[in-house]
Every structure is written in structure tokens, then in C-alpha cells.
């Protein structure tokens, strides 16, 4: 008997966008669009008849906005939701509110050129729906108690990293922490960073997220945390009490000058179908920081970061993978564990301790 298809409900007030998304999803063998609604009011009528596995939701609609609808869904019957947002500052801020309210993924809707969207973003949409269908939504609403303190060929990070020029340098007192995450990571990072005191090692973080969204994400985390959390800029120095978020649409690598660590924010091809890529970050940390670093891989779909975490371990770094029970999607940590890349497997509520204590 064939596996059951992932049933999807689309909610978007644009008839053209609905048509494009339906065409993409129904052309995918393991996905079926069970309905499409122009706004949340019509969506609720459809939900009264049939409940989908995944909801793809616009956040800016008439009659009832997507955030209000999302909160209603999560309070009544938690369901994986993929946010389909415009690539604007307003769209980014609203989408981050949606992630905080329980959405699991963000995709950007076409602004111009639907043909290009069909070519460039079809795989992104399909991957987001599959990730949502595999997510553990009950972990999205969890919060830790306050602490006592485009489809392209799947390139590896070799396409970005400079050629090897020697072993990682060890004669420095600075310690850095590299974190990589994807689906469910916005909530997980909030839980970890808000548990940290002002005095802690410098951090570099890759969260898979569209361009223009990471600035709003960093600003939000900065307002919630005791530490400083900016979006990274090229040549920023990694300092204690600072967590640099890789910009969407760019790769971020760690480099070193003397006893200090810096980031390089660069263009480049998709790596493991992502930009920024966790592997690009982790493998650069392995090269330039070695035993002075800790690598942490958290909730997310796919295998981005698994190889890089193994390289960090082999270079002398301490390494951590989030455990299955606390992940929204146990994909990236699972692949790292398969490679024997993780020295420790930890629940989300303990990961901040791995940052504070090697």
C-alpha cells in the first residue's frame, strides 16, 4: 500500500499565488492540496470538514490576519504551519511574529516573475512542507524556565572554503561557540540565548532563513537577551557576550588574525541547498579555531552541518547535538550523530550550559 500523501491547505488572498503554489505542490508525488482558501474565515470553513497535515499561510490578509488565525489554530489543534510571506521588512517582522506563535518554516512568495518562482523556489516550498509534516509541533510552544543565571546541485562547503593552509592555531585564550539550526531553530535559539548571562563566550550562528529576515530576527533576539545579538557584517570581531547571526542569502565563515577571531560574510553558491550553510560555518571554525571552539547542531531538516561538526570534533573542538525529544525536526542532529560527530547529546533546556562550560 502506498504511503499516505501529505495533505496541505493553502490560505492566501492572491488568486495568482494560490494557483502557482497549488501547481507546485500537486505536481509533487507525496503531496496533495486538499483545499485553498482566500482568507482565514474561508479556511476555518474548510477545516470544519477536513483537517490537513500542513497549512501554508499568508500572514497579511483581509478580514483576519494570519497571526490571529495561527494563534487560534495552535490553541485549538496544533498543526504544522509554513508561512508564505512577501520579501519585505514588514513581511519579515510579521513572519517572525508567526514563528514565535508556532509556525515551523518561512518561504518567500513571488513578487515579480511567477515563472522564475516556479523554477527557483519550487524545491524550497516542497522542502518546507515536508519539513513541516515531519515536525514535532508540541515542542514549538515549550519555553525553558528562567535560568538561575533554489534548488541547485547539492554543493558541499568545499565550494566556499579557502584551500587548507595548516592546522588550527591553538595559542589563544579566546573561546568561541558555533551554532547551526534550521526548522524550529528560531524558538530553540530564543530559548538558548535568553538563558545566557551577559558574560559568555562569543558565538557565531547560522539559522536557515530568507534574505532580509535575519536582521529582524537578530533584533528580536537582541531585545530578549542579556547578550548582544546583531546580524553579522563582514569583518566583525567575535567577542565575549556577542552572538553574530549570519545574514540570510550570505555565507558566514570564521577566520583569524593574531589571537582574535573574525567573520567573513560572503556571496557564493548554495551549499547543501542553503545560503547561509551550517557546514560552511562549522568547517571554517574547525580550520581556524580547532580546540578553542564548541560546535552545537540543533533542530532542523536535512544534513547541513553534520560533516562540519565532525570536522570540528576531529580538529579538537567539543561538539553537541540536540536530542530527539526536544527537537521540532530531528534531522540535522540525527545526521551528525550518525557520523559520530557529537560528543554529547543534550536536551534543549541544557544546551546553554554547553556554551558556558566546555
Swiss-Prot record:
Its EC number is 3.1.1.61, 3.5.1.44. Its main location: cytoplasm. Residues 7-124 form the Response regulatory domain. InterPro entries: CheB-like, CheB_C, CheY-like_superfamily, Sig_transdc_resp-reg_Me-estase, Sig_transdc_resp-reg_receiver. Keywords: Chemotaxis, Cytoplasm, Hydrolase, Phosphoprotein. GO terms for cellular component: cytoplasm. CDD domains: CheB_Rec, REC_CheB-like. It comes from the Bacteria. PANTHER family: PROTEIN-GLUTAMATE METHYLESTERASE/PROTEIN-GLUTAMINE GLUTAMINASE, PROTEIN-GLUTAMATE METHYLESTERASE_PROTEIN-GLUTAMINE GLUTAMINASE. Belongs to the CheB family. Involved in chemotaxis. Part of a chemotaxis signal transduction system that modulates chemotaxis in response to various stimuli. Catalyzes the demethylation of specific methylglutamate residues introduced into the chemoreceptors (methyl-accepting chemotaxis proteins or MCP) by CheR. Also mediates the irreversible deamidation of specific glutamine residues to glutamic acid. This is Protein-glutamate methylesterase/protein-glutamine glutaminase 1. It comes from Pseudomonas savastanoi pv. phaseolicola (strain 1448A / Race 6).
Amino acid at each position: 500500500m502506498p504511503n499516505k500523501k501529505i495533505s496541505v491547505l493553502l490560505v492566501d488572498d492572491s488568486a495568482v499565488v494560490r494557483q502557482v503554489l497549488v501547481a507546485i505542490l500537486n505536481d509533487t508525488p507525496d503531496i496533495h492540496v486538499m483545499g485553498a482558501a482566500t482568507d482565514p474565515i474561508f479556511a476555518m470553513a474548510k477545516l470544519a470538514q477536513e483537517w490537513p497535515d500542513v497549512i501554508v499561510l499568508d500572514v497579511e490578509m483581509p478580514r483576519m490576519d494570519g497571526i490571529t488565525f495561527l494563534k487560534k489554530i495552535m490553541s485549538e489543534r496544533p498543526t504544522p504551519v509554513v508561512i508564505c510571506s512577501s520579501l519585505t521588512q514588514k513581511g519579515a517582522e510579521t513572519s517572525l511574529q508567526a514563528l514565535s506563535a508556532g509556525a515551523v518554516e518561512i518561504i518567500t512568495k513571488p513578487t515579480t516573475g511567477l515563472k522564475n518562482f516556479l523554477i527557483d523556489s519550487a524545491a524550497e516550498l516542497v522542502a518546507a512542507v515536508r519539513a513541516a509534516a515531519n515536525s514535532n509541533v508540541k515542542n514549538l510552544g515549550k519555553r525553558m524556565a528562567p535560568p538561575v543565571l533554489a534548488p541547485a546541485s547539492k554543493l558541499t562547503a568545499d565550494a566556499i572554503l579557502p584551500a587548507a593552509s595548516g592546522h588550527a592555531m591553538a595559542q589563544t585564550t579566546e573561546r568561541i561557540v558555533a551554532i547551526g539550526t534550521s526548522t524550529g531553530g528560531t524558538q530553540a535559539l530564543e530559548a538558548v540565548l535568553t538563558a545566557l548571562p551577559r558574560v559568555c563566550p562569543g558565538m557565531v550562528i547560522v539559522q536557515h532563513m530568507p534574505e532580509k529576515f535575519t536582521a529582524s530576527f537578530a533584533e528580536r533576539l537582541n531585545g530578549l537577551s542579556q547578550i548582544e545579538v546583531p546580524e553579522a557584517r563582514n569583518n566583525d570581531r567575535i567577542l565575549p557576550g556577542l552572538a553574530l547571526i549570519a545574514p540570510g542569502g550570505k555565507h558566514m565563515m570564521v577566520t583569524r588574525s593574531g589571537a582574535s577571531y573574525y567573520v567573513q560574510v560572503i556571496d557564493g553558491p548554495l551549499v547543501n541547498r542553503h545560503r547561509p550553510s551550517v557546514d560552511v560555518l562549522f568547517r571554517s571554525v574547525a580550520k581556524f579555531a580547532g580546540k578553542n571552539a564548541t560546535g552545537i547542531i540543533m533542530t532542523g531538516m536535512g544534513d547541513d552541518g553534520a560533516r562540519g561538526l565532525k570536522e570540528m570534533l576531529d580538529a579538537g573542538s567539543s561538539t553537541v547535538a540536540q536530542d530527539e525529544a526536544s527537537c521540532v525536526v530531528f534531522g540535522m542532529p540525527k545526521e551528525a550523530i550518525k557520523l559520530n560527530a557529537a560528543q554529547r547529546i543534550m536536551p534543549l533546556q541544557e544546551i546553554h550550559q554547553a556554551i558556558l562550560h566546555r
